[in-house]
Amino acid sequence: MSMWIYFQGLDPSVLPGDPAGFEALFDVEFDELRRRVRAGEAVWLETGFFQLDEIYWSRGDGELPVFGGRQVPDPAGGPGHVAVDPPDVVRAAAYLERVSFPDLWEDWRQRQTPAPDEDLCDRLVRYHENLRTFYARSAERGWAVAKYFSF
């Protein structure tokens, strides 16, 4: 089973407010999603994003979780969507700029049994850098972020 999460930066005036609006935003050809990622308007994460969320939460300092936001439930029972308003995008960008991923990884890795492999570390480093760049760009533009989950 394929699992992924897609983050889309957008002007807050067009941030969907209901499940149908989110479905319309993300109901595009895969090539369009890839174009958005290449243009820096979006980020796509696959295997490992659950672990990355745990790593960010391990700080325990009450920062906005990068994967958090306002839940928009799916009436059909799917994973739903998440909306992040511009002030929280700024907070997430500041958090990602401030944290040391190697330190977070080491703290998290020491609590795992069995120890995670280096392939996972390499993937999560790339995800962290992609998210850091994406949230910084979105914050600079005053954007909101819409998230689409697929499980």
Question: Model regions: which residues?
Answer:
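Acidic (Asp/Glu-rich) sequence patches and key acidic residues
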Residues: 1-133, 137, 151
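Secondary-structure boundary elements
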Residues: 136-144
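Short, well-ordered beta-strand elements
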Residues: 145-149
